[in-house]
Amino acid sequence: AGLDPASTGYQAAFLWGYDQTSNKLYMIDMENSLGGGIPQALSIMKNWFVKYNLAHWVIEENGFQRAIRQDQSIREFAGKHGIFLEGTQTYSNKHDPIFGVTAMRPLFADKLISLPYLGFEAQEKVNLYKSQLVYFSSAQNKSRTVGQKSDLVMASWFPMKTIRRLQKERLATMGLEYEPSFGGYEGSSIDIDSWR
């Protein structure tokens, strides 16, 4: 899950489910609430631990947000329940076309992201997320996004580095059948050092 903390304004949390076999991401839940800070961050961590057994958070750490992972009550709760708190810093890399927020665009285009739309609550959450996606600007000119919230978009993007790592780890452990392009050799029949 990703957490975009806020001391004032809106704090956002976003939870993805990742299916390794289909390589698809599923939006499980999100929360976007006014106010925030440490009490709200701890509250969402507790709620989602109970509800989803969530044990990995990627938390933005620009400025004040660094205090979230350093807070004693959050550290104690995370330590007691085996929750990994991973920090991330965004700065200008959120606008990077390869690793930034807009790098998620092909996932939507290739239908590798599934957003739930069954039921009123799911529709409200998805509509809010989609509206923030529409107004998120990949341009570094911030004047385009003045007045537009992007908390949910950012919270949904924070776990992407972790998800990409999981994808690479899965590929690295896959058993691939290898057929050499040359014939006549068996792996066990070569008995010479041809490189000498």
What feature does the model see in each segment?
Residues 1-87, 114-196:
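RNase H-like, metal-dependent nuclease domains and their acidic two-metal-ion catalytic environment used
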Residues 77-110:
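Conserved beta-strand -> loop -> alpha-helix junction used to position metal-binding or nucleic-acid-contacting
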